Amino acid sequence: MDSERIQQLHYDRIAIEYEAHYGDACSQRYRDRFFHQPMFKGVDLSGLEVIEAMCGSGHTTQYLISQGARVIGLDISDETIKSFNKRWPESQGVCASILDSGLDSDSFDLVAIVGGLHHLHPNVNDAIEEIYRILKPGGYLCFAEPHKDSFPDLIRRWWYKRDPLFADNEEAIDLSEMKRRFASRFIFNRERYLGNAAYLLVLNSMVFRIPLKLKPFYTPPLLHLESIISPFQGRLLSCFVVCQWRKK
């Protein structure tokens, strides 16, 4: 079974609980501050043709639309795309794989992925190849993913093997290897290592089995704490990396 199909079946089993935890207002506040703002820094999104790849219900689409982008959501799950189209009628959902999207070459200004690439092992590089194909020259690939070679990843790897919330093929991305492979085709504009207290307990409340009713009470202080710690984080102590690449 291919990596995307494994993830689709896994997600379908946990979809209701997943959306409750990752789609609530507290998690969206986290995304906007620590994913979306650094991912799209310096990019005028107004009027751009954008793909949210592996879109789910469109958590990043919400931000992109607010900035004036025209968004297509791409996901392998037909049920997910139905939900996406219902939630974002001004956008278009396409049921297709990011490994072979069927979309026209050189046709999009930006592709955004939040937490999707690490679900694709061992096919991450194949996804980047497809993204490169559909991006216009000068187009952006913006992504946020758990990364290897960090202390949090050591814990994550131990946890993934023992927690049924994670599929067997989930693995943090090897950013150094990705950059070596694609150095001739992308300019690496931005790279920021982030993720500490609020990432763990606000965004990932489902992983820690935290009751949803508690999140509104502890979210504000943890967001503030994460903002204080973030400027001092590097690769070794961060939970994820935010990258902005540009097609040559």
List the model feature ranges, each with a label.
Residues 1-45, 142-165:
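Conserved class I S-adenosyl-L-methionine
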Residues 51, 57-100:
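Class I SAM-dependent methyltransferase SAM/SAH-binding core
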Residues 99-111:
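A short acidic, Gly/Pro-enriched loop at the edge of an enzyme's catalytic core
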Residues 110-123:
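A short SAM/SAH-binding and catalytic strip from SAM-dependent methyltransferases
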Residues 125-137:
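A short glycine-rich, Lys/Arg-flanked "PGG" loop and its adjoining helix->strand segment in the class I
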Residues 156, 160, 190-248:
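A C-terminal cap/extension of S-adenosyl-L-methionine-dependent methyltransferases
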Residues 170-186, 190:
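Short alpha-helix
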